[in-house]
């Protein structure tokens, strides 16, 4: 199974949930029906763990992100950056089998691929503050 690809799918699903306010099961069903993403080697157990973990711990995760923002508020972040930060923060806080540096690096890679030009440095700064604390 490919964790990077699974993280990317989880990010797409969480982003979609933040926009459409639909249940995860409905978003997942629509995603599988309409995606052009190759779903081979995607770990749906891992995706479920991330999505459900973030949904169950969103308040704590968002608090942790906000504590590590410099001169920013959570509500000013783009939805994609917030989604990426939530995934990596969840991994840092709750998934001991993932080294913090891996969670940070994966977040930077997602930001490079899906967000604005300045987002990788921003994501790195927020998460860097978090793992130093």
From Swiss-Prot:
GO terms for molecular function: RNA binding. Signal peptide: none annotated. It comes from the Bacteria. One of its GO terms (biological process) is transcription antitermination. One of its GO terms (cellular component) is cytosol. Gene3D superfamilies: NusB-like (1.10.940.10). Coiled coil: none annotated. Pfam families: NusB. Keywords: RNA-binding, Transcription, Transcription antitermination, Transcription regulation. Disulfide bonds: none annotated. Involved in transcription antitermination. Required for transcription of ribosomal RNA (rRNA) genes. Binds specifically to the boxA antiterminator sequence of the ribosomal RNA (rrn) operons. Belongs to the NusB family. This is Transcription antitermination protein NusB. It comes from Clostridium novyi (strain NT). The gene is nusB.
């Amino acid at each position: 199974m490919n964790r990077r690809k699974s993280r990317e799918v989880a990010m797409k699903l969480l982003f979609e949930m933040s926009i459409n306010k639909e249940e995860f099961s409905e978003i997942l069903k629509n995603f599988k029906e309409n995606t052009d993403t190759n779903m081979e080697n995607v770990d749906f157990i891992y995706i479920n763990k991330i999505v459900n973990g973030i949904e169950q711990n969103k308040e704590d995760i968002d608090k942790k992100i906000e504590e590590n923002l410099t001169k920013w508020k959570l509500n000013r972040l783009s939805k994609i950056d917030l989604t990426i930060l939530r995934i990596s923060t969840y991994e840092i806080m709750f998934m001991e089998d993932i080294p913090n540096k891996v969670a940070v690096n994966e977040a930077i890679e997602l930001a490079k691929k899906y967000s604005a030009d300045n987002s990788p440095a921003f994501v790195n700064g927020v998460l860097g503050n978090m793992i130093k604390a």
